[in-house]
Amino acid sequence: MKRRNRAQRLLRLTAVYLLLLPFLLLGWLYSRLPDRVYLEPGQTLLLPRFGWVEPMGLHGSQNAASTQVVGSYQTTLSLGGWLPIKNIRTVVTERAQVTVCGTPFGVKMFSEGALIVGFSDIDSPGGSTVNPAKAAGLRLGDRVIRIGQVRTENNDAVKEALEAARGSAAEVIYVRSGEQRSTTLTPVWDVAAAQWRAGMWVRDSSAGVGTLTFVDPEKGVFAGLGHPISDGDTGESIALRSGEIVPCEITGCSMGTVGSPGELKGKFLSAHAIGSIRINGENGVYGTTRTGFSGQTMPVAFAQEVETGDAQILATVSGETPRTYHVRIEKISDADPRRNMVIRVVDKALLSRTGGIVQGMSGSPILQNGRLVGAVTHVLVNDPTRGYGIFAQTMLEQAEQVATAEK
């Protein structure tokens, strides 16, 4: 009797799982499908990474899976042409052509507010050790934008604000995780330094080296890195107040090994800016330029056109001139906008020089089938021969936002 009841429960449970399985699979597929696709006029919508998925049609005056008319349309993706899965936006547009670079550039950036990068206790006149910043609830990575009536746009402004408070409680406006907050801080007289202090170290600027992905000379915009510029101590993305890019050359490289990412080393060649940074975003740095950059004019691939298999990257590991190296695109995903591809370096020359992907190569263009398909963004710490990439289409969208804002 007990065995029969156990068998019946198992059968019922199995039946429930079998009933739920199709819905779970459809939910998984829904989350993996893109929200938007781009097509050239007359191009048929194909999603080769989703073999059984096809469009049911474009709603509007145009029919089915292609159109000759530039515009935006709603498309219903279906399983096998009959089971609707997801409504997406199909944008029909002329294919963009950009100048593909792969050249190094220097970055000089000033943050919006003073970023807290450390704390140090203070010996007060009473002999006790205190830390006003910690007592006020401030944390590593918080961005202080005002103390009292003083806007803290740089380190000197923080010092000025503490001097103005002169030991009185002052309201502190700061940003944490994108949310503006407030607290009260009371500066303490530092006997050793003979000045008013808060017990926090702040930084208002950053500098580094990256790789330029592409330039659109007609629109006067550039794109690089493929990820945000972050503070080296806190890992927080730097909120941009102003920034510029300058000429740079690569002077050396430390090889990447398992557990220890390598790094390109460079130096700025001039203080003269060759571009102004407008966005420091999760998909890279973008800005305006009227400087002529050398490179090859290439079409930008739409995300659905990127394939697993052989590809190339343009990278500069010495001097100022990029070289082409062979890689393999192992995996493609539409789910994470920051990690669309997993790539593996297979070029022996690059492996012997750098060990694979190293810091400073972020932004190196990824080429496939005569098109710009993406940019290198990160190295896998436990395997320096592999790394992540972002779709070029995503970077192009961001660059076009800069161009539109400058009009």
Regions found by a protein language model. Name each.
Residues 2-3, 57-100, 278-325:
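Interdomain regulatory linker/hinge segments that flank or connect interaction modules
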Residues 110-135, 139:
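PDZ/PDZ-like groove recognition
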Residues 186-359, 368-369, 377, 383-398:
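Serine endopeptidase catalytic core focused on the charge-relay Asp
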